[in-house]
Amino acid sequence: MPVEINGLLNHNISSETHPVPFETFDPEGIARMAKLHDAWGYDKVLVANAAIMPDNFTIAGYVAANTTRLGVMLAHRPGFIPPTMAARMLATLDRLMPGRVGVHIITAASDEETQADGDYQTKVERYDRAKEYISVLRRMWTDKKPFDHEGKWFRFNGGFAAIKPTQGTVPVYFGGMSPAALEVAGEYCDTFATLSDTVAGMTEVVGKVRDAAAPYGRSPRFLMSIRIVIADTEEAAWAQADEIREAVAANMGKLAPNTAAVKADGFKRTAELAARGDRLEKCFWNGINQLRGGQSNSGTLVGTPAQLADALMDYYDAGVSAFILRGFDPVEDVIAIGRDLIPLLRAKVAERDAQLAATEPAMA
């Protein structure tokens, strides 16, 4: 399966090593970063969503206006916008950037944060609502006539989208490690998205999600978000990692705590992973996870382009065929990953797929 390689697009150019105030909204920076990801071979960028963040639908449209081949993975919370309207919004965006839109359905880990937008459902209720929401989205994208719906969470008559996605649907990404999340993922998601982990950890995650999907006859794809430290030599890469740790430590007072992380099952895994040591497996580095107490999705692969490609192939062999790859320098690392790692990883995946195809029995 071809590998999907994505980046992350913020509403300003910042990171733990280059912090700017969260309130800074930088349209020129958004356009610059979108164009960089577009030029350096990324498939999509994740455009995040939270109660205090700028509207990401508007940002996604701005990305579309400033790129030619880049797609977006749009984080979206069910319930704030009715699914009928959201389906039309996503289909419209997908027609503006033909076939390059994915929607990452997120339910939020923190009740307090969702209450800031007037949503007082519990986490379990939000997962239950997500099931119905995704079902309505897909009917809106595929049904050729208006339809009525009366469910637990949504009710409408004559729902219809005259505009349809370019490829008939919009891929649905979903994540979460709680039992309720795995239940939704198994039945509904096209791609299961998760935080950084070791190969052994991801093998466990893949197994759990596949078990949840099996009763529905489904086989979702898997995406992992992981940080990258890349250099010409192994020694230089680890020296750079040490410099990053020092820079983040110096900036800790400028970084907002991720209070929602303490309630998220995925971040609990991150904290447990951080407690296991500084370096794990081939080149997995916990330095920033440890520094931030497991509240940051900052598991990192450190090494040369060849070492990093080999490490990512271990994940590919474990079932992960999509990644969000990002470094710590918000500009230079986008370029370095796109120039030195992405072509190498795509070539290795193509070679592996060709080898597998050659060993499969010929069709009768």
Language-model segments: residues:
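Catalytic domains of carbohydrate-active enzymes, especially glycoside hydrolases
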Residues: G29-A48, V184-F192, D314-S321
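Conserved, mostly hydrophobic/aromatic
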Residues: H37, G41, V63, L93, ...
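Alpha-helix-loop-beta-strand connector modules within alpha/beta enzyme cores
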Residues: N56-L74, R129-Y133, P215-Y216, R339-D353
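An alpha-helical appendage that flanks or caps ligand/catalytic pockets
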Residues: P2-H11, D117, K123-T166, D197-Y316, ...
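Acidic-and-aromatic substrate-binding clefts and catalytic sites of carbohydrate-active enzymes
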Residues: V47-N56, G79-T84, T198-E204, I230-A231, ...
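N-terminal beta1-alpha1-beta2 module of alpha/beta enzyme domains
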Residues: M1-T67, Q167-V170
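Short, acidic/polar
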Residues: F22-L36, F174-V184, L301-Y315
